[in-house]
UniProtKB/Swiss-Prot annotation:
GO terms for molecular function: ATP binding; glutaminyl-tRNA synthase (glutamine-hydrolyzing) activity. The active site is at K77, S152, S176. PROSITE patterns: AMIDASES. This is Glutamyl-tRNA(Gln) amidotransferase subunit A. The keyword Flavoprotein does not apply.
Amino acid sequence: MYKFSAIEIRDQFIRGDVSASAITQHYLNRIAKYDQKIGAFLSVYEEQAMMQAKQLDQKRLANQPLGKLAGIPIAIKDNILVKGEISTCGSKFLTNFKSPYQASVIEYLLAEGAVIIGKTNMDEFAMGSSTENSALQKTSNPWNLKCTPGGSSGGSAAAVAGRLSPLSLGSDTGGSVRLPASFCGVVGFKPTYGRVSRFGLVAYGSSLDQIGPLATNTADTALLMEVIGRHCPKDSTSIALGPEDYLSQFKDSIAGMKIGVPWEFLENLADEPKKIFQQSVNLMKQLGAEIVDIDLSILKYSLAVYYILATAEASTNLARFDGIRYGQRSPKAKTLEEVYDFSKEEGFGAEVKRRILLGTYVLSAGYQDAYYKKAQKVRTLILRSYKEAFAKCDLIASPVSPFAAFEIGAIKDPLQMYLEDIYTIGINLAGLPAVSIPNGFSKDGKPMGLQLIGAQKHDREVLNAAHILEKSLAFHPAIPELVKEETSA
């Protein structure tokens, strides 16, 4: 079962070849067997998932309509709210926080017959690139347990890579879906800003955050986008576009397409990732695409711009976690001021505190003009550079990360960790759609990813091109040795 795609699983269920209960139990068994080593899940909804599955079985037997995701288990990043369930955001601060309402994307998933199987680990409040900043547990990469799965959606990527769930949802503020997808050898898609509702997503950087799907292949990713990509009246930033057909509209060729490559921005890329990326570029040429050199040199400022704007938004968003309205209240506090101070001191981890301090600093009266407002101006220039690039090409190609997955604990310097996002953050600053697809392995057997970037609202074109390349790469979704079984029962 675990070797099948999500679409194949759904079709088998609809035909009556297998019950939703059997599908769900299969993945629950795999979680019980393998997740002790991987650590992808913070909570597993065993009873609730089986109840949902049995209801789907009854609907099928009664010949009632079944949704696009009928019978497919899905894992959810723990900053996306599921009503009545604990949502920790990977933080001690929210260890016992039960969501009083449902995220819009969860409503859409349930309406289409998906089975919510559990919540996945993440960097605390989505602040990190390795999932090492989770205050609750360690998550390992299924390809190499000594390595990180990437972050901040590391649990969601590890769950899919380990075949503990056919699909998962993550969130992407600066690369947090694409980077773990690259490290774990799966597909991760960051939609156009506003294409997927953020209602019920715990905010980190409100102008940057976007919920995105992870799967073993692009067709499953596109299927999930057909369900979650729609206008939501509860989200003021939601684009006024209805659901879109992806799979039925996919073309079968990229011949004649212009693919832009920002070679100047990639000049410091190490030899091995550069070689793997070059092989993908050569493949695009063989498939009839024209490779165009584009200028995105302004992206050398993207890291500074991102960490000014994202931290400024984070300091504002996390102000609500004060021990009174949300979160754990410090038992040491004797006054209202102490409740605020002690609760945050005890509840937040080091990286969250670092980013709140930086954000508060750049928003302070003496420095707002020098940092925050200047960063906003450069963000506008970055958006303009992308628009100029897309006047010359249809899509842009780049690596996802400067390197493959690194060992847990190997990067101590926060600035070095921030550089991991150098090829992904510009996309969030410009609100563009981008996908990471597996395009090879390093010499020591770690997956690496190719990033395809589209203009705003060209989500389908990005996934279409990724689908064509995926087939041409002959990269049949590889399965880590750790989680392979002799039978698919």
